């Protein structure tokens, strides 16, 4: 019993020691490009509640923009922000330029939350 407890405590201790190593990269250390190719530092959003979304304008989930906008409007005065990152890597479902995507979202769903330049989200081997 005591031997098992020591082993368990050792595992927990090692896991806790690894947390700072795993947490060194946080969202505030990243910079991204907006639709005008300007660099935006995510540390500018520090203190806000962020919902970072990967979106597409030509897929079955495109109507999510309506719900995202409603969430944003409801909670933005309490520090909530939706950060929208379109991606064309999944079946080419986010075609067009940033301007095309932005115009589509604003005219069809009235989006006002920050929308960034298209990103690639797949890893090297995906």
PLM regions with names:
Residues 22-43, 126:
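N-terminal "domain-start" segment that seeds a small globular fold
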Residues 34, 54-58:
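Amphipathic alpha-helical repeat scaffolds
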Residues 46-51:
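Local sequence-structure signature of Cys/Sec-based thiol-disulfide redox active-site neighborhoods
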Residues 61-125:
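Structural microenvironment flanking redox-active thiols in thiol-disulfide oxidoreductases
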């Amino acid at each position: 019993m005591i031997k098992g407890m020591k082993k368990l405590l050792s595992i927990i201790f090692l896991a806790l020691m690894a947390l700072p190593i795993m947490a060194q990269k946080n969202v505030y250390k990243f910079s991204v490009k907006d639709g005008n190719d300007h660099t935006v530092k995510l540390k500018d959003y520090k203190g806000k509640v962020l919902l970072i979304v990967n979106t597409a304008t030509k897929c079955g989930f495109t109507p999510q923009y309506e719900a995202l906008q409603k969430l944003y409007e409801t909670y933005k005065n309490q520090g909530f922000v939706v950060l929208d990152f379109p991606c064309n890597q999944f079946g080419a479902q986010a075609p067009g330029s940033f301007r095309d995507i932005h115009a589509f979202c604003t005219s069809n769903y009235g989006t006002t939350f920050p929308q960034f330049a298209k990103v690639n989200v797949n890893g090297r081997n995906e």
